[in-house]
């Protein structure tokens, strides 16, 4: 055991400093500053090097966290990075946006003993940024190019991870995306104050330099059928994610200035990338000077709230039907939102949208927590005669996402889906009801975390490789 480790008794937990609230509210830059070199080494040395590393157990990617913490504590940064990236295609992304408090850090043994968790995410970000700065992150070098090609539909975390893994094996990889930029949720869904866009674009450029081809503004079902795409490639992966907004069907739902979360966030991100966004420029999808109400309690709701603050909203309120302890969003993000001036109105649910042509107010019911539902969470129940009214010029619905009707969009009735609309894929092989067509990420498991998308993409690459290798053996035989 290195003498540099197990310092958690002597060294307290310390996170990277946040930028001043008054400063960070004025822009979309990331709010967390990076560790200084000595601080990263010091915080890494707090790891207790557990015999059973629960941080690794609770990471979807099973990242070798204790090992790269030890290497960081010893100042062996390049080795730490190489170990980190061996199991994770985007450590610079996960270090920034993973809900570590629910995964690795939340299960850190020294956290359970009252010493404060090792700051795993911040250290992961530190060693990865150091790798980019020092040129340790390099394009993929192919020793032997294979003849087979794979088409990937969707350039989000699952599609990018799968494409990279297949390219490493020598396959020709083409990634198709309906949008004008690659990155999916990473580029248009997550605000810059959590994930600056140059971080995503840097990774995309690296994949292009590795020989992966990106075809943008391409819609399966319009520009090509799934059948035609399947004939063009030796295998296909569907990794479209889930983008259909869940609705709240209430009186007044047809009033103007009520928008789904992704429409609001996409407009903001496009504007930040320098695009001309008419609905933003004319004030429609812009929170400036408005009383904003966001409905929902997940991380997307937090993104909408904090984006509204940065657009200089007059007021920003969040309606959530349960209490703080039962909120699905990251506790860290809730705290950041409160620091920036967001008002959370717990145990409330919208009853009616009111206004003449456009939204003017939201009628809200007070809620109380009843008996647990099937998920084990206490079910919110309306308190009788408890409704009250909140002024609103802009309402954003952040109630989660469902799959689009892909068989209809892709014009492919053979593509089987579950009763929830997610694609049916074999649990082991990830192959769909169509031979040679695989699926991964949120379109299979439902809306989830970026880290799970990366995990699914890596697994899909293994399955596709096995499929193509078995086809090759049959041809040889």
What does each model-identified segment do?
Residues 304, 443-468:
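A conserved FAD-binding loop/helix module that cradles the flavin
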Residues 278, 282-316:
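Predominantly flavin-linked oxidoreductase catalytic cores and closely associated redox partners
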Residues 36, 209-230, 276-284, 347-393:
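A structured beta-alpha segment of the ubiquitous adenosine-cofactor-binding alpha/beta core
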Residues 3-33, 62-74, 83-85, 112-121, ...:
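Beta1-alpha1 glycine-rich phosphate/pyrophosphate-binding loop at the start
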Residues 68, 93-96, 101-153, 169, ...:
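FAD-binding core/adjacent interface of flavoenzyme oxidoreductases
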Residues 55, 59, 157-162, 292-294, ...:
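Extended, hydrophobic alpha-helical segments in both membrane/secreted and soluble proteins
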Residues 254-289, 373-447:
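FAD-site-proximal beta/loop scaffold in flavoenzymes
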Residues 34-54, 78-103:
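Immediate flanking context of iron-sulfur cluster ligation sites
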């Amino acid at each position: 055991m290195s003498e540099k480790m197990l310092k958690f008794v002597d060294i307290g937990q310390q996170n990277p400093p946040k930028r001043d609230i008054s400063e960070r509210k004025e822009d979309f830059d990331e709010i967390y500053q990076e560790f200084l070199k000595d601080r990263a080494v010091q915080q890494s040395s707090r790891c207790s090097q557990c015999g059973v590393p629960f941080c690794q157990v609770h990471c979807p990617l099973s990242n070798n966290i204790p090992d790269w913490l030890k290497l960081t504590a010893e100042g062996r940064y390049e080795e730490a990075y190489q170990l980190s990236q061996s199991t994770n295609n985007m450590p610079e992304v996960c270090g920034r946006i993973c809900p570590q408090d629910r995964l690795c850090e939340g299960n850190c043994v020294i956290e359970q003993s009252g010493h404060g968790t090792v700051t795993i995410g911040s250290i992961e970000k530190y060693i990865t940024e150091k790798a980019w700065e020092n040129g340790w992150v390099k394009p993929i070098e192919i020793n032997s190019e294979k003849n087979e090609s794979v088409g990937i539909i969707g350039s989000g975390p699952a599609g990018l991870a799968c494409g990279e893994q297949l390219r490493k094996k020598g396959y020709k990889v083409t990634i198709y995306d309906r949008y004008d930029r690659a990155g999916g949720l990473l580029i248009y869904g997550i605000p810059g104050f959590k994930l600056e866009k140059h971080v995503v674009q840097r990774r995309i450029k690296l994949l292009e330099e590795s020989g992966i081809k990106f075809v943008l503004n391409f819609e399966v079902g319009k520009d090509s059928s799934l059948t035609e795409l399947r004939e063009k490639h030796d295998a296909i992966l569907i990794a479209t994610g889930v983008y259909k907004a869940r609705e709240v069907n209430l009186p007044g739902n047809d009033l103007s200035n009520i928008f789904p979360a992704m429409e609001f966030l996409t407009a903001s991100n496009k504007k930040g990338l320098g695009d001309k966004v008419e609905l933003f420029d004319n004030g429609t999808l812009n929170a400036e000077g408005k009383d904003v109400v966001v409905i929902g309690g997940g991380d997307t709701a937090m993104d909408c709230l904090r984006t509204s603050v940065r657009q200089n909203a007059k007021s920003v309120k969040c309606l959530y039907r349960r209490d703080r302890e039962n909120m699905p969003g990251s506790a860290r993000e809730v705290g950041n939102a409160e620091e920036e001036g967001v008002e959370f109105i717990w145990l409330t649910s919208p009853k009616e949208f009111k206004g003449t042509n456009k939204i003017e107010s939201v009628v809200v019911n007070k809620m109380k927590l009843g008996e647990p539902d099937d998920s084990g969470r206490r079910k919110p129940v309306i308190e009788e005669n408890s409704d009250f009214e909140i002024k609103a010029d802009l309402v954003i619905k952040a109630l989660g996402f469902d799959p689009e009707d892909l068989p209809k969009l892709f014009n492919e009735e053979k593509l089987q889906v579950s009763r929830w609309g997610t694609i049916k894929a074999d649990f082991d092989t990830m192959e769909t009801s169509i031979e040679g067509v695989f699926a991964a990420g949120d379109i299979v498991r439902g809306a989830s975390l970026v880290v799970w998308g990366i995990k699914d993409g890596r697994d899909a690459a293994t399955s596709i490789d096995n499929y193509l290798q078995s086809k090759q053996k049959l041809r040889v035989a």
